[in-house]
Amino acid sequence: MAGYDVVVVGGGHAGLEAAWAAAALGVRVALVTVNPDRIGMMPCNPAVGGPGKSQLVAEVVALGGLMGRAADAAAIHTRVLNRSKGPAVQSLRVQVDRDLYALKAQEILAERPVEVLRGEVAALWVEGGRLLGVRTVDGRTLPAKAVVVAGGTFLSGVVWYGRKSRPAGRQGEPPARFLSQSLKAVGHTLRRFKTGTPPRIRADSVDFGRLEVVPPEVPPGSFTGNPGPHAARLPTWQTRTTARTHRLIRENLHLSPLYAGDIQGIGPRYCPSIEDKVVRFADKESHLLFVEPDGLSTTEVYLQGFSSSLPPELQEEMVRSLPGFERAVIQRYAYAVEYDSLDPTELTRGLQSRLLPGLFSAGQVNGTSGYEEAAAQGLLAGLNAARFALGLPEVHLPRESGYIGVLVDDLVGRGTDEPYRMMTSRVELRLLCRADNADERLTPLAVAWGLRPKEDLERVEAKYRRVAAELRRLQALRVEGVSGLQWLRRPENTYRALAERFPPSEPLSPEEAYQVEVRAKYAGYIERQERLREKMKDLEAFRIPEGMDFPKVPGLSREAAEKLSRHRPKSLAEAARIPGVRDSDLTALAVHLRRGA
């Protein structure tokens, strides 16, 4: 029977990247989704990037992914957040046209031979402990060597409007009704998580004159170096909740399915609903909200920071309690969605199931929240699914390589009891793993893995040769009694001013000039983090034999033995990141390993 090398289940941000990456390796790929017209759709905020997230997108771009291209092509407003802080935490956020983003994502996907199939996957096709493909609700059998599950919030999804609920993966779309049972049958542990989305407001019902305007930056930023034609087109706005907003929420918490105990799923700590904010931060008089256009021609605005599961009739009052929204008309109500997710500790660092070879998963089904986290996982899962189909060994990104490495290491090594969100604070080497140098860090791997052509690496290498040459020139240059590099390290000095006084033989591009300035000004911090990276590599090189009997290791605490037995780390570095494993436990384990255990 003719079949596929890789079948991807789901057409969201994880599924898109999985299919795109798998197809790069030349294997036959099918993407199965209930509604192909909704591929790449943004069910929540119409934006890509932000702190911790733009770094993920930069790494996806460096690895040949499509999210950055689609975001740039659909951009309508861009800003760099944390610009007043250091380069490690500066983060691009790109507001996009929601419909245009999905269209561009679909157009990019069509550049590779991915067969898009309409349908709902009902079950994994497993015989004799071997994965053979998937079966659909309408009775089709799709043979495949590898399967990537990227079902988002659709696995046994339920949406909530107040105390009322109905089965759905998101508003107006049916859930994946049967796939959860198939994953359980394989032996996977499923948990219930929950997320939510704010109301959409009719733009002509908002008094924008009462809102604070946030203009787009000019020139606009971009993830790929190619800003779209509308990237500086529209502003966004800000407003705040009021005492009346908070009173309405407090007086009606009994109508919230979360506070009434109807929702069992755990919600995202770092993206709370407005009722969560009012309860958890009771001392705050108001909360900042962002009013974002949904697109160039849409009649809706998105009320970021106002997600809710309270009843629609109460949402009307809540929204109209906001300055500028006194006459607001809600076009689509806020709601919460509860869904099944896997325990990511049951996965390898290549996002393959430890229980069923050839089964991969990515995105919210792995316990994360956010488009960017989903895209990063999708790329890695799709790459490894294709490699599995070709009989090649699994690859992964070590923690010290960047944000994707940290994301996967946290999920697989530590697990998560709530929807996981990437933040810059999670990354130990964030000064080395900036968004601006993702191309230098990851393009060599992308080329080696077949995700990008060799010519891309040649361009990146040429760029950083020019940067290195300019740093050498500045070291030899004398400026006001010191070297050019020492002069540039002074806070008040800039590379632009230095290059105007002592121009290089060939001008650097803005990206190259930025690299020179960062490497000069932060040289001491960079050297310190490079030493930390070497220490992390040393721990990573300290391998732990498969099947080690941890309870028999002398000096190991009982808690550590239990945690190590559960997580089965492959190195001392992985063991060090498991909660409950102390330094004394690592010392005992290292001594045991040195003795040849």
From Swiss-Prot:
The keyword Cell membrane does not apply. GO terms for molecular function: flavin adenine dinucleotide binding. HAMAP family: MnmG_GidA. Belongs to the MnmG family. This is tRNA uridine 5-carboxymethylaminomethyl modification enzyme MnmG. Gene3D superfamilies: FAD/NAD(P)-binding domain (3.50.50.60), GidA associated domain, C-terminal subdomain (1.10.150.570), tRNA uridine 5-carboxymethylaminomethyl modification enzyme MnmG/GidA (1.10.10.1800). FAD binds at residues 10-15. Its main location: cytoplasm. PROSITE patterns: GIDA_1, GIDA_2. One of its GO terms (cellular component) is cytosol. NAD-binding protein involved in the addition of a carboxymethylaminomethyl (cmnm) group at the wobble position (U34) of certain tRNAs, forming tRNA-cmnm(5)s(2)U34. Keywords: Cytoplasm, FAD, Flavoprotein, NAD, tRNA processing. Homodimer. Heterotetramer of two MnmE and two MnmG subunits. Coiled coil: none annotated. It comes from the Bacteria. The lineage of its organism: Bacteria, Thermotogati, Deinococcota, Deinococci, Thermales. NAD(+) binds at residues 267-281. One of its GO terms (biological process) is tRNA methylation. Its cofactor is FAD. It is found in: Cytoplasm.
